[in-house]
Amino acid sequence: MPRQPQPAPFDGALVINKPQGKTSHDIVDAVRHLAGFRQIGHLGTLDPLATGVLVLLLGKATRLVRFYTGRRKRYTAGFRFGFATNTYDSEGVAQGPDVAPVLDRGVIERLAAESVGPFEQTPPIFSAKKVHGRPAYELARKNEVVELKPAPVEVFEYRLTGMEGAMARFSIECSSGTYIRSLAHDMGQKIGCGAHLAEITRTAVGEFSLEQAMEIEELAAAARKGKFQSRLIPLESLLPNLPRANVLPILEKRVRHGGKFNVTVAQLQPGHMELPPGATTQLEPEGAHAPRLRVFSQQNKLIAIAEAVVPRTYQPIVVFDPLP
């Protein structure tokens, strides 16, 4: 008989402060080595140039990835004016000579303000967007023609925080899928001197912030002391914006079989958000009429995520440790 896969020994989330020069895959590989298992996913990659928040989900928590779709992101970013690059960041090839720009704070603030709101953004050709099944950057490296369709994005905050020489720094909150590189390139085009992204730190993904993030070296030190699990955000603490209900053992059995179940008003507890400093402003606790629910046992173990089919009747859509 084929060997059955062993369950992951740890379930929960890690917030890593990714260093510059490392790929997101490098960090995932490092955590897999420290944890001793491969069941690890993430909530969005970072380019090697970028530093900051990389959220990893481990074990059973990987089944929650879809519920984080659309979480807003926050960044601090430095735009270097004077020339554009083919990748829109400092790792690309300069497109023209480096001119000494004369930057006007008022103009930059106006252009940033004009980009707040929803709009269509064309991704950089040096991106992982697929073209006929292949990443666009593969085609761009071969100097093949790359045509990418604009995608809807939204910028919620785009605030100038400082200027020094040819560099301007910003605080940005945006929808998932927004390219900060493109914001830098577009501003340079509008000013007429060219610009590219010189530095960037992701400071938040939804409710996860840089305040919570640890260096990979910190995690390695904890693992050497046998305290890897102590650095996890527990499975039961994830998706805190969703309401919860603790069910009795007889109902727990039904839930773990995947059957519909009813919840009384008295059982429902609204979502409870205690956002760390720097988290995005998007999330609000959801009440009794929320379309989804976290289901807990009497021992406060998360056993399922369920979806409302009619008021106060729910269908499990993710079941942890299901019964046959």
Report the location of each language-model feature.
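RNA pseudouridine synthases
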Residues: M1-M214, A304-A306
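Accessory RNA 3′-end/elbow-binding domains used by RNA modification enzymes
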Residues: M1-H42, L46, A50, G106, ...
